[in-house]
Amino acid sequence: MSYIKGIDISHNNTVNWSKLDPEIKFVYCKATQGHGFKDPAFNTYWQYLKTKGLYRGAYHFLTATDSAQDQANNFLSLGIDFSKPNVLPPMIDIEDQVPASLNVNITKDKNAFIKLATDWINIVEAATKRKVVIYSYKNFFAEYLNNHSWPTNPLWLASYQPKEPGLPVGYKDWSIWQYSQDGTIDGKIHGGEFDLDYFNGKLQDLDKL
């Protein structure tokens, strides 16, 4: 199987881009969280990745206590043109709340949380004309999403093991695999370790994501 290397980052990471591993071809950057947070490093990362011609993507961290519309408005307010070359589809990060004790806001009504995610996806897809990438992990689908699936959306799975990730119910394949949350790469200065990713395809297939 052919994999393309990538990373995903936020303001918690600082990168010496001049030393970035040349095998890394795509970078997803945290853009927003909830109804009001915008990652303070996003604009700097976004513009630099453009100058380097790397594939670049933006993601939103879904919070259980804010409305889908408010969260979508926060993400869309960045004004990203998803029709531009090398711009990857929006990604929604559906996982444990921060801190994880806030997962109680999911478990008290899992169907409401599923609807929240679905509504965000629908709003953002209508606005951007791109299929949203779904990020989560297999156990989260089972424990918090009642094994609900979005089978027409690209799937990004977190699975920190040497073999390919197991698929959640309702999925036939994965598009991106986050295989490490504590990896190191050439170009890291400080700010914790990097999330390391594989894209399931060839470089030109990123244009079809």
Residue positions per predicted region:
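Glycine-rich, charge-decorated loop segments at or immediately adjacent to ligand/cofactor-binding or catalytic sites
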Residues: 67-70, 142-148
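Hydrophobic anchor at the start of a short beta-strand
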Residues: 56, 130-132, 155
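Short, solvent-exposed loop/turn segments at secondary-structure junctions
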Residues: 99-101, 140-143
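Substrate-binding cleft of extracellular glycoside hydrolase catalytic domains
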Residues: 1-128
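Histidine- and/or cysteine-centered catalytic micro-motif in compact active-site loops
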Residues: 61, 95, 137-139, 160
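Aromatic-lined carbohydrate-recognition surfaces of secreted/lumenal glycan-active proteins
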Residues: 128-142
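Functionally critical loop-and-helix segments that line ligand-binding/catalytic clefts
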Residues: 1-10, 15-18, 146-209
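Short His-Asn-centered micro-motif
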Residues: 9-10, 30, 135-137, 158
